[in-house]
């Protein structure tokens, strides 16, 4: 009995010691990949914030992506102000918080960028700005991006990340789909290149409009791409669908996108694509 009492005492001391040590360990050191479920030490994500196992690109702010994507950037339309046309409960507070967190006036960052002396119009959607939803200012900024690109004879590269149209703005947000699509059409009629890069997640009205209108449609690995979410689909058709139904790899196999591109390769390959399509007489 004495032996068991000693073991109990040792165990209690060990538990207390571990508990104290555990309290000093900061949170966020280990992150679980939402796609492959592998536990990742936070520093192993690197500057690109990608899973070293399956190459899934973790969701990042638009300005964070900008830091490693381009050499120079001139931002446009920072003065546009999002309104609350429906006086939707809590919308103003959500906007203020999203603007403070993202340092954007709405869910997309737009401007003129350069990589290796290649100039192009660039748009980057922010998945953390009210789920990257598309409101009237988002639509206006993207429309102006294409209009400027058409005037300046520039290609457009647009990184999409969105939960769809912003419900707090009602029908006005849905109207942005046709508004942007018209600007995309005019840009295309001018014989200019449009590249979309799908990032996680790209859904709803953004998928149903400008995200899938690119001349070249690329995607990051394991990005979710679809119109309705998996749960909505299952409730509609009353049957289970595969977990990877809307993964970029499945969408690629079915011919809806052209290629999958890792984050560390994006700067070089996007510049190369713009260069070869700007060569006179290349095709």
UniProtKB/Swiss-Prot annotation:
It is found in: Cytoplasm. Its cofactor is Zn(2+). Residues 29-283 form the CoA carboxyltransferase N-terminal domain. It is an enzyme of class 2 (transferase). Keywords: ATP-binding, Cytoplasm, Fatty acid biosynthesis, Fatty acid metabolism, Lipid biosynthesis, Lipid metabolism, Metal-binding, Nucleotide-binding, Transferase, Zinc, Zinc-finger. Pathway: Lipid metabolism; malonyl-CoA biosynthesis; malonyl-CoA from acetyl-CoA: step 1/1. InterPro entries: AcCoA_carboxyl_beta (IPR034733), Acetyl_CoA_COase_Trfase_b_su (IPR000438), ClpP/crotonase-like_dom_sf (IPR029045), COA_CT_N (IPR011762), Znf-ACC (IPR041010). GO terms for biological process: fatty acid biosynthetic process; malonyl-CoA biosynthetic process. Binds 1 zinc ion per subunit. A zinc finger (C4-type) spans 33-54. Its main location: cytoplasm. Zn(2+) binds at residues 33, 36, 51, 54. It catalyses: N(6)-carboxybiotinyl-L-lysyl-[protein] + acetyl-CoA = N(6)-biotinyl-L-lysyl-[protein] + malonyl-CoA. Its EC number is 2.1.3.15. One of its GO terms (molecular function) is acetyl-CoA carboxylase activity. Belongs to the AccD/PCCB family. HAMAP family: AcetylCoA_CT_beta. Acetyl-CoA carboxylase is a heterohexamer composed of biotin carboxyl carrier protein (AccB), biotin carboxylase (AccC) and two subunits each of ACCase subunit alpha (AccA) and ACCase subunit beta (AccD). PANTHER family: ACETYL-COENZYME A CARBOXYLASE CARBOXYL TRANSFERASE SUBUNIT BETA, CHLOROPLASTIC (PTHR42995:SF5). This is Acetyl-coenzyme A carboxylase carboxyl transferase subunit beta.
């Amino acid at each position: 009995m004495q032996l068991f009492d000693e073991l109990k005492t040792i165990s209690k001391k060990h538990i207390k010691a571990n508990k104290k040590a555990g309290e000093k360990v900061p949170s966020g050191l280990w992150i679980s990949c939402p796609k492959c479920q592998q536990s990742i030490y936070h520093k192993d994500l690197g500057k690109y914030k990608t899973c070293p196992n399956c190459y899934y690109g973790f969701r990042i702010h638009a300005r964070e992506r900008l830091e490693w994507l381009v050499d120079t950037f001139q931002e446009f339309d920072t003065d546009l102000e999002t309104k609350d046309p429906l006086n939707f409960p809590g919308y103003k507070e959500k906007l203020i918080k999203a603007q403070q967190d993202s340092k954007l006036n709405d869910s997309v960052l737009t401007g003129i960028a350069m990589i290796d002396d290649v100039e192009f119009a660039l748009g980057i959607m922010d998945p953390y700005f009210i789920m990257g939803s598309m409101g009237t200012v988002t639509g206006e900024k993207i429309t102006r991006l294409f209009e400027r690109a058409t005037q300046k004879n520039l290609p457009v590269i647009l990184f999409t990340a969105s939960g769809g149209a912003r419900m707090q703005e009602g029908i006005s947000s849905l109207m942005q789909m046709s508004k942007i699509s018209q600007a995309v059409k005019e840009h295309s009629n001018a014989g200019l290149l449009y590249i979309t890069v799908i990032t996680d997640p790209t859904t709803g009205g953004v998928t149903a409009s400008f995200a899938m209108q690119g001349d070249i449609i690329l995607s990051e690995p394991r990005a979710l791409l679809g119109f309705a979410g998996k749960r909505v689909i299952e409730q509609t058709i009353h049957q289970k669908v595969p977990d990877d139904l809307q993964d970029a790899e499945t969408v690629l196999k079915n011919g809806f996108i052209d290629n999958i591109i890792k984050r560390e390769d994006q700067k070089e390959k996007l510049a190369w694509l713009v260069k070869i399509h700007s060569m006179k007489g290349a095709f």
